[in-house]
């Protein structure tokens, strides 16, 4: 049975993951840190994150949001790429190159590392570190 991880830090988050998910998320954590070392690791909204930017929430409050975040979901792992350019969300624009994954506007969902095209993910991460943001 899936049990959502509740944590107060990335270290706590990783420690609470089941072994199979922990291996995947630790790999992605290292991959992001290697390919975007300028994005400071953080822990926002119960997710390990990398880099952050300010945006106005629905109540017009100024919030910190991660540029990239990773999360263990019930049936897959999600990598959130909160980055845009004039054509919209970066993840969505690269969905055909990312491998055997499901892609939403800013979310890349996959079950195994082998499903990801790591070269394409690296490209998306490197664009994200230069263009963080959300389409509002």
Please report, for each region that a protein language model flagged, where it lies by residue.
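Charge-dense, helix-prone N-terminal extensions
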Residues: 1-136
């Amino acid at each position: 049975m899936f049990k959502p991880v509740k944590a107060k830090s990335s270290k706590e988050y990783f420690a609470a993951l089941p072994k199979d998910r922990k291996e995947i998320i630790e790999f992605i954590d290292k991959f992001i840190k290697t390919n975007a070392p300028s994005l400071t690791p953080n822990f926002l909204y119960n997710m390990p994150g990398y880099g952050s930017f300010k945006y106005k929430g629905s109540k017009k409050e100024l919030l910190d949001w991660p540029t990239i975040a990773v999360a263990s979901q019930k049936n897959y792992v999600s990598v959130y790429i909160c980055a845009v350019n004039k054509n919209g969300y970066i993840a969505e624009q690269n969905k055909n190159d990312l491998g055997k994954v499901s892609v939403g506007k800013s979310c890349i969902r996959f079950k195994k590392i082998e499903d990801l095209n790591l070269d394409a993910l690296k490209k998306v991460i490197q664009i994200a570190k230069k263009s963080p943001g959300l389409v509002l």
